[in-house]
Amino acid sequence: MSSLYLATVDAFLRNPHTRHRTCADLRRELDAYADEERREAAKAIAHPDRPLLAPPSAPPNHSHLAARETAPPPAATP
């Protein structure tokens, strides 16, 4: 890296006003992005008359999962 770049970064990190301003700018951008994401998510919420996903035709069979989820009995301590 060039020494000019490193000197600029060092000056930035040592100046609390610059760091604070950059942090505030980033926070403002993140807040705007989060607001936009919330608006898009609100638009995508399914309406009762038009659901996003079709209901399943049959309930899923989870019997094979139950056998794997049972834990072995604890070992006896001597």
Swiss-Prot record:
Residue ranges, compositional bias (Basic and acidic residues): 39-50
Pfam families (alphabetical): Herpes_US12
Database matches in InterPro entries: Herpes_ICP47
Keywords annotated in UniProt: Early protein, Host cytoplasm, Host nucleus, Host-virus interaction, Inhibition of host adaptive immune response by virus, Inhibition of host TAP by virus, Viral immunoevasion
GO biological process: symbiont-mediated suppression of host antigen processing and presentation
Segments of this protein annotated with the region Disordered: 39-78
Compartments in which it is found: Host cytoplasm; Host nucleus
Keyword Cell wall biogenesis/degradation listed: no
Stretches the record annotates as Active domain: 3-36
One GO term describing the cellular component: host cell nucleus
Family that this chain belongs to: Belongs to the herpesviridae US12 family.
Known partners and oligomeric status: Interacts with host TAP1 and TAP2; these interactions inhibit the loading of peptides onto MHC class I molecules.
Task performed by this protein: Plays a role in the inhibition of host immune response. Binds specifically to transporters associated with antigen processing (TAP), thereby blocking peptide-binding and translocation by TAP as well as subsequent loading of peptides onto MHC class I molecules. Empty MHC I molecules are retained in the endoplasmic reticulum and ultimately directed to proteasomal degradation. In consequence, infected cells are masked for immune recognition by cytotoxic T-lymphocytes.
Domain notes for this protein: The N-terminal active domain blocks peptide binding to and peptide transport by TAP.
Protein name listed in UniProt: ICP47 protein
Species annotation: Herpes simplex virus type 2 (strain SA8)
